[in-house]
Amino acid sequence: MPTINQLIKKPRKSQKEKTASPALQNCPQRRGICTRVMTVTPKKPNSALRKVARVRLSNGFEVTAYIPGIGHNLQEHSVVLIRGGRVKDLPGVRYHIIRGAKDTLGVNNRKQGRSKYGTKKPKA
């Protein structure tokens, strides 16, 4: 426990708040170019082939982003828009690709939760 005099000489440092998505640099989304599209396997109790992409962002960061939904059209050099949001069972994946923006198409035959997957309203 420091004395009052010690605190006058050297005050306490306020703790910096850590951000969950540092590559966005306080922006809601960032544009990037896919450098690699691949599948990865999740952590222990789960089993699947999750679709992810390595993305070089417009600010120079290179991040791994998850591709949500069933099926996608992404390949190398596709331009994508990413947002924050981690995938709990994929270590190191802290970003999501936004479906229906830039080169990413929306999910086909999606009826519910369409706004999250960039799908247009079906014709009645």
Swiss-Prot record:
Pfam families, per database record: Ribosom_S12_S23 (PF00164)
GO BP annotations, alphabetical order: translation
GO molecular function: rRNA binding; structural constituent of ribosome; tRNA binding
Chain positions found as 3-methylthioaspartic acid: D89
Positions of region (Disordered): 1-24
Top-rank lineage group of the source organism: Bacteria
Function summary: With S4 and S5 plays an important role in translational accuracy. Interacts with and stabilizes bases of the 16S rRNA that are involved in tRNA selection in the A site and with the mRNA backbone. Located at the interface of the 30S and 50S subunits, it traverses the body of the 30S subunit contacting proteins on the other side and probably holding the rRNA structure together. The combined cluster of proteins S8, S12 and S17 appears to hold together the shoulder and platform of the 30S subunit.
UniProt record similarity statement: Belongs to the universal ribosomal protein uS12 family.
Protein name in the entry: Small ribosomal subunit protein uS12
Origin species: Borrelia hermsii (strain HS1 / DAH)
Lineage: Bacteria, Pseudomonadati, Spirochaetota, Spirochaetia, Spirochaetales
Gene name linked to the record: rpsL
